[in-house]
Amino acid sequence: MADPRRPARVTRYKPPTTESNPALEDPTPDYMNLLGMVFSMCGLMLKLKWCAWIAVYCSFISFANSRSSEDTKQMMSSFMLSISAVVMSYLQNPQPMSPPW
């Protein structure tokens, strides 16, 4: 039995680019980055420990869902802001976090 494949018709796979179709880009890292910054500011200004911890969580999600080709400066600044919110909230009040309800 002969090989039915035609070598002249074989084409190499090229993944679709996000420049041609912006709907393929996932907005989750950007949203989590923004949420992380908002929660870390609330944690710093209002001294809410649970806001600071949610900011750290959002920063981790943003980092985990980001692409390697993206600029990491904004992500790292958001992460450092959330860590500083946790540190500052525990430096001002070292007691364990009380439930928000």
From Swiss-Prot:
Compartments where located: Endoplasmic reticulum membrane
Induction and repression of expression: Up-regulated by FGF.
Topological domain ranges for the Lumenal compartment: 47, 91-101
GO biological process, one term: protein insertion into ER membrane
Topology of this chain in the membrane: Multi-pass membrane protein
UniProt keywords, alphabetically: Chaperone, Endoplasmic reticulum, Membrane, Transmembrane, Transmembrane helix
Topology Cytoplasmic: residue spans: 1-27, 66-69
Family: Belongs to the Asterix family.
Oligomeric and partner information: Component of the multi-pass translocon (MPT) complex.
Protein known as: PAT complex subunit Asterix
Organism for this UniProt entry: Gallus gallus (Chicken)
Gene for this chain: WDR83OS
